[in-house]
Amino acid sequence: DAPIVKKIQSFAYKNSLKETDRATYQAMEALIHNLNTMNSRAGAQTPFSSINYGTDTSIEGRLVIKNILLAEEAGLGNGETPIFPIHIFKIKEGVNFDPDDPNYDLFKLACRVSAKRLFPNFSFIDAPFNLQYYKEGNPDTEIAYMGCRTRVIGNAYDPTREIVTGRGNLSFTTINLPRLGIKAQRNIGAFFDSLDELMDLCIDQLMHRFKIQCSKRVRNYPFLMGQGIWLDSEKLTADDTLEEVLKHGTLSVGFIGLAECLKVLTGKHHGESEEARELGLEIISRMRARMDEETKRTGLNFSLLATPAEGLSGRFVKMD
């Protein structure tokens, strides 16, 4: 009769939710474990990967967000913190920022996990430099960051398509600021001359690599291009070259060791002296202006970033 049917339905529903929740957790756990063990990048490295999440309020989306966070919190074998993927939790007022927002509980969970694992990092859609691109109801316009911390959304090549999906960073080269500071021997003018020279060299290198990448064909990238992952790649045939697709990507110059560079040049870093802080801002502003100048000249997306340098920091110290 009706009460029994209702009881059976309730039992089936609760157990289905429980099983789906468990299966989702295992899927997220598998994703994290696979991305830390598969050596498919250049045949010898794990993929440098990142995932951005936090704003999906659907039942399914919330289930995935919750379980990717719980799997990250649990860690790898022996409780080790997973290096990849880089987790970025997107924060938006009306979605997960305030206590009354539908995903506020997931924001609190993200804070708990970050306190233990240092991931996820957090991005703010409402920040003015991100909000200018945001269109409500269009997740493609929600800011996303790559594993290398490249911010991909502005598009000088095609301003009508300032979106995050189907795009990425093509190449970046890092400048060793402490080395330039040491060579300048506290001569600020000499430092900036060396920096300008190195910026020009980096841009030449990025353009050279870009031309090599553009000369490749769709068949050389059967997944990224052949499966239509990159923006406009679905319009190409197997023998087409890639320039019109790759122009949507970014070409980046990174910098490392700003604090150490300031210490060498002034005796103090930006946290110890207002003079050093002003010089630090001048250094970064000069590099940013050079990137903007190149963007205007070429119509390509040149960007500046602070290199994460998980491995490079040690290499540069040894080289110096």
Regions found by a protein language model. Give the residues of each.
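Conserved catalytic cores of very large enzyme subunits
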Residues: 1-247, 268-269, 273-320
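Contiguous, well-ordered alpha-helical segments that form the cores/surfaces of helical PPI scaffolds
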Residues: 251-264, 285
